[in-house]
Amino acid sequence: AIHFLLALGLTLSVTNCFAQISKEQAKERKALVKSSKSELNEKATKTARKEAKKLIKEGWKSAPGALPLEKQLDKSYIMQMEYDEDMFPKFIMAEAMSIGQNYDAAKMQALELAKQNLAGQIQTEVTALIENTVANKQLEPEDAASVVQSISAGKSLISQSIGRVIPVVELYRTTSNKNKEVLMRIAYNATMAKTAAKKVVKENLEKRGDDLHEKLDKLLGW
């Protein structure tokens, strides 16, 4: 199985119903924000080379017409290392794999699965953003809990709200029974991700007669 490197802080632990970024992850994100473009490129290239060796050993190849495997990974890690001043990723990343009798069918299924995983990543990152407003005493814990509940219940709605994604990595390999296995890694613009989450939260809160979404507009710039 292929996994993102945990060191890049894409996996957040959940505590007290909030997705919290660990001190180590927050520290790394701050360091990445302060890094120069050349430093980020160097770090991304180093990480990409390491993963490329692993993937090639496992039989993965670049899709026809796509960039070389290492170049795709390089681009992926550069995008993963970009954060704004609130430590929110500039791109939400997700990936998935699928096996099919032909390449196109496997690719389509992998893309759909990646979008579902993307919805989960959006949930995680936006929940962490909400938790941060509580830490900064901008939002009361009970209000935050209400918002988090809306986000947690809305994964399928977030998934439906996702617009155009950016395919960043597209690899394939042939299985022992001649089927095609495709790996897709996609990226989604952070602004669009927040918009997708906002829509779900707003609709949920309005159904309950809660005007909390107006406060979120001011606090989070939604």
Show where each model-derived region lies:
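Positively charged n-region of N-terminal signal peptides that target proteins for export
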Residues: A1-H3, A19
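Domain-level marker for long, solvent-exposed, non-transmembrane regions
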Residues: A19-W222
